[in-house]
Amino acid sequence: MLLPRQFYARDVLIVAKDLLNCYLVREYNGHLLIGKIVETEAYHQNDPACHAYRGKTKRNEVMFGPPGHAYVYFTYGMHYCFNVVTGAIGRAEAVLIRALEPVKGIDIIKTLRGGKSERELLSGPAKLTQGLAIDLKLNGHDLTGGKILYITKGEPVAEEDIVVTTRIGINAGKDLPYRFYLKNNKYVSKK
């Protein structure tokens, strides 16, 4: 089942946890590339690590809503990162999808990733955007439309199977427990 807009129109910390075990689906050249979401990070406007912390810009305007859209950005001059916009319109919240477990289209994902091992295919934000061919053309894409790029419902995850910890690769807000991942999943980027 496709996740509806109201799923995303909730607090970023709730959505970040609830996205675990859901499926990110990418339609690519007539094929479906699917990964199970196994790791996320939450960012909100009052968070110093958030792109919207200092207000709205051309780069981050998608974060201000509506919820259920893709926020894709280019970083370090070489990588893309994929986020899901959450919360109320104007609130600037997003969930960074950090890692996926490959489910379908693995041969195509391997080609896009240059033949990496299955464990390394989608186990990081830049790896998953490369493996699913996600770039700036998908920034602002409506994930509730059920075409090109979307998320479908997965099985609920018990609280005891979710690890809550601090985020990776940031300086500001690095002590906030806004990173979530599935316990014992080998596709998580870093434990």
UniProtKB/Swiss-Prot annotation:
One GO BP: base-excision repair
HAMAP family xref list: 3MGH
Single GO term (MF): DNA binding
EC category: hydrolase
Similarity-based family: Belongs to the DNA glycosylase MPG family.
Record PANTHER family: DNA-3-METHYLADENINE GLYCOSYLASE
Organism of origin: Carboxydothermus hydrogenoformans (strain ATCC BAA-161 / DSM 6008 / Z-2901)
Keyword RNA-binding: no
Pfam families: Pur_DNA_glyco (PF02245)
Protein name in the entry: Putative 3-methyladenine DNA glycosylase
